[in-house]
């Protein structure tokens, strides 16, 4: 099991570090664009990166981190267990076992339409519990949801379920993850 305080601190520092890193990369890219514009104003030059591009870069890196953690934790947790027979059992494993290891609680609600769509709901998502005002930390919420989405993507991919995950936290700390299976 992952130490709760260690995980909280790790998530805060990872989000801050990735935001800082993305801002630095965007500044470097914008400096190159400015240099190209000064040297040859008539040539085709890519547009400058905006603040939303920075946020997307940071969220993408956070999701990648979550994918790595989810895939490797799933492999460790399933090392001595029999193979899970069907998709529903694999998703239940992620909701119960993996979520418990990372956030010390299970997913509160799992729904499916039995046609390749699962909705996982967490009524008290630990990574968002400390937020007082929903709008005050939009970037933080986005980063935490990116990590959790990546965690789900990595775990399900390691279980042989290619999918896409869309996270929604309209009223933090309540959040839901819409998992859509890819057709094989």
For the regions a language model picked out, list residue spans one by one.
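N-terminal accessory segment detector
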Residues: 1-142, 183
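Eukaryote-biased feature marking scaffold/signaling PDZ-domain proteins and nuclear chromatin regulators
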Residues: 113-115, 147, 160, 172-174
């Amino acid at each position: 099991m992952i130490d709760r305080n260690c995980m909280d601190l790790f998530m805060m520092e990872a989000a801050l570090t990735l935001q800082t890193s993305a801002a630095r990369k965007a500044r470097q890219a914008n400096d190159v664009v400015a240099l190209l514009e000064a040297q040859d104003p008539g040539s085709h030059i890519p547009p400058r990166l905006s603040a939303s591009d920075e946020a997307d870069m940071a969220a993408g890196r956070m999701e990648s981190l979550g994918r790595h953690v989810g895939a490797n934790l799933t492999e460790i947790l399933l090392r001595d267990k029999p193979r899970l027979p069907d998709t529903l059992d694999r998703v239940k494993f992620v909701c119960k076992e993996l979520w418990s290891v990372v956030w010390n609680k299970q997913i509160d609600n799992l729904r499916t339409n039995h046609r390749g769509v699962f909705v996982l709901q967490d009524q008290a998502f630990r990574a968002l519990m400390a937020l007082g005002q929903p709008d005050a930390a939009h970037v933080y919420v986005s980063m935490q949801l990116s990590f959790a989405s990546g965690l789900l993507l990595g775990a399900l991919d390691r279980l042989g379920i290619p999918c896409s995950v869309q996270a929604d936290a309209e009223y933090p700390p309540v959040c839901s993850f819409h998992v859509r299976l890819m057709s094989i």
